[in-house]
A protein has these predicted regions:
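Electropositive, glycine- and tryptophan-enriched low-complexity nucleic-acid-binding patches
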Residues: 1-33
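Active-site-proximal loop/turn and secondary-structure-junction residues that shape catalytic pockets
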Residues: 8, 43-45, 68-70
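Short, conserved catalytic/metal-binding motifs centered on acidic residues
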Residues: 38-46, 62, 130, 155-164, ...
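A short acidic (Asp/Glu
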Residues: 47-52, 73-77
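Short, surface-exposed basic-aromatic patches at helix termini and helix-loop junctions that form
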Residues: 51-60
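An anionic, glycine-rich sequence signature occurring as long contiguous blocks
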Residues: 61-164, 248-259
Length: 260
C-alpha cells in the first residue's frame, strides 16, 4: 500500500492524484533509480494531468481505462462487426482488438495510443478501451489489454478485502478528518496483516487467506491473561483449534531481529 486518501463526493474521482503521485514517485526513485514505474487504473483516473505528468517523467508509464463514447465506438466498428460474426458462428464470447491514435475534443493536450477491445457477448456488443504510453513494439494490443490491464482486477480485490475485512469504507462520522483517520487506522491494520502474511504465514494454510479469515482464526480468540513481575502469561483454551498454527507463527516472528 502506497497511499490511502478519502475525497469528497462532490469532487472528481481523480482529484489530487498528481499531488499524491509526486512524493510516491520520488520515494521510489530514491530507492530504485532505474526501475520503471507503470501506473495502472480504471477510467476514473483517465485525466490529462495524470497522463501528462507520467509523460514528463522518464521510466514512468501508464495504462488507464478509457470511458467509451460514440467516436471511440465508431473507430472499432469493423472489429465489432467481425466479433459479432464470430459470436454468431461459435455462440461464444468473441473479441477483436484495434490499436489506434486518439485525442479527445478538448480535454487532452495531445494524441495518445488507445487500444480498443471489440467484444461481442450473448447480451450484445461490449466495447472497452484503454489508453497508454507504452509503445506497441513492447506490447501489442491484445497482450497489453488481456495480460497487463486486466491484471488490475487483483488490485481491486485487495481494496475490497480492506473494505470488507477492515472497515475501510466506514464513514459514519460527520467530519472528513475523522473519517480519514479511520481510513488510516484501517490501512495500518492492513499493512500489519500483510506483513504477517509475508513473515509469519508463508507456507501455512493461511498464507493466502484474507484479512477477516486471519483475524477470526489468529486474533479473535479467547484467552486468559496473567501479569507477573517479569512476564505476561497468555493461557489459551484447550479447545482452541489453531493453537499449533499460532505457536508456529509466533515462533517465526520471534526469529526476526527485533521481532516478538
Amino acid at each position: 500500500m502506497l497511499c490511502a486518501r478519502r475525497r469528497g463526493a462532490d469532487k472528481d474521482p481523480a482529484s489530487g492524484v498528481v499531488t499524491e503521485l509526486k512524493p510516491i514517485v520520488e520515494k521510489l526513485r530514491q530507492a530504485w533509480p532505474e526501475v520503471r514505474i507503470i501506473l495502472r487504473a480504471d477510467s476514473g483516473f483517465c485525466r490529462d494531468a495524470i497522463m501528462s505528468y507520467c509523460e514528463q517523467n522518464t521510466k514512468l508509464d501508464y495504462v488507464l481505462g478509457l470511458a467509451k463514447n460514440s467516436r471511440l465506438i465508431k473507430r472499432i466498428g469493423a472489429e465489432l462487426a467481425q466479433a459479432q460474426k464470430l459470436h454468431q458462428s461459435s455462440h461464444k464470447a468473441a473479441r477483436e482488438f484495434k490499436d489506434f491514435r486518439y485525442r479527445t475534443g478538448h480535454s487532452w493536450s495531445c494524441k495518445r495510443r488507445v487500444v480498443g477491445k471489440a467484444q461481442y457477448l450473448a447480451k450484445g456488443a461490449n466495447p472497452r478501451f484503454i489508453v497508454t504510453s507504452i509503445a506497441s513494439e513492447e506490447h501489442d494490443a491484445r497482450s497489453l489489454y488481456e495480460d497487463f490491464y486486466c491484471a488490475r482486477g487483483d488490485m481491486e480485490n485487495r481494496i475490497k478485502e480492506q473494505q470488507l475485512g477492515l472497515f475501510a469504507d466506514r464513514t459514519s462520522t460527520a467530519s472528513m478528518r475523522s473519517n480519514q483517520l479511520r481510513l488510516y487506522f484501517s490501512s495500518f491494520a492492513y499493512i500489519l496483516i500483510q506483513t504477517l502474511r509475508r513473515l509469519g504465514l508463508q507456507g501455512s494454510e493461511l498464507a493466502q487467506a484474507q484479512c477477516d479469515t486471519i483475524g477470526l482464526k489468529l486474533f479473535k480468540i479467547g484467552a486468559q491473561i496473567r501479569v507477573t513481575v517479569r512476564k505476561v502469561w497468555v493461557s489459551f483454551s484447550e479447545s482452541y483449534p489453531y493453537l499449533h498454527l499460532f505457536q508456529r507463527v509466533f515462533a517465526r516472528l520471534e526469529q526476526i531481529p527485533g521481532g516478538a
